[in-house]
Swiss-Prot record:
Matches recorded under Pfam families: Toxin_12
Molecular functions per Gene Ontology: ion channel inhibitor activity; toxin activity
Keyword tRNA processing in annotation: no
Localisation per UniProt entry: Secreted
Main subcellular localisation: secreted
Purpose of the protein: Ion channel inhibitor.
Key words of the record: Disulfide bond, Ion channel impairing toxin, Knottin, Secreted, Signal, Toxin
Pro-peptide region(s): 25-52
Family the entry assigns: Belongs to the neurotoxin 10 (Hwtx-1) family. 51 (Hntx-8) subfamily. Hntx-8 sub-subfamily.
Name of this protein: U3-theraphotoxin-Hhn1a 13
Organism annotation: Cyriopagopus hainanus (Chinese bird spider)
Tissue: Expressed by the venom gland.
One GO CC term, this protein: extracellular region
Length: 87
């Protein structure tokens, strides 16, 4: 009976490190796609949106003037496309 208890103890003691190693490698595999996507979609300084002196489409035009091709809506105070009915 003693041998049976010892063999069960050794088996369980051997399985615990195996489970720990498997869990650690699985968690690394789960982190790998996240790291890859974050490196692919990382914002580079060259591609950051530049601050303009004018407001673009559907932007507030209270303080800034609208860019060429847009007019400031008197009702909403947004830069919109000029149209005949907006006078």
């Amino acid at each position: 009976m003693v041998n049976m208890k010892a063999s069960m103890f050794l088996t369980s003691a051997g399985l615990v490190p195996l489970f720990v190693v498997c869990y650690a490698s699985e968690s690394e595999e789960k982190e790998f796609p996240k790291e890859m996507l974050s490196s692919i979609f990382a914002v580079d300084n060259d591609f950051k949106q530049e601050e303009r002196d004018c407001a673009g489409y559907m932007r507030e035009c209270k303080e800034k003037l609208c860019c060429s091709g847009y007019v400031c809506s008197s009702r909403w105070k947004w830069c919109v496309l000029p149209a005949p009915w907006r006078r």
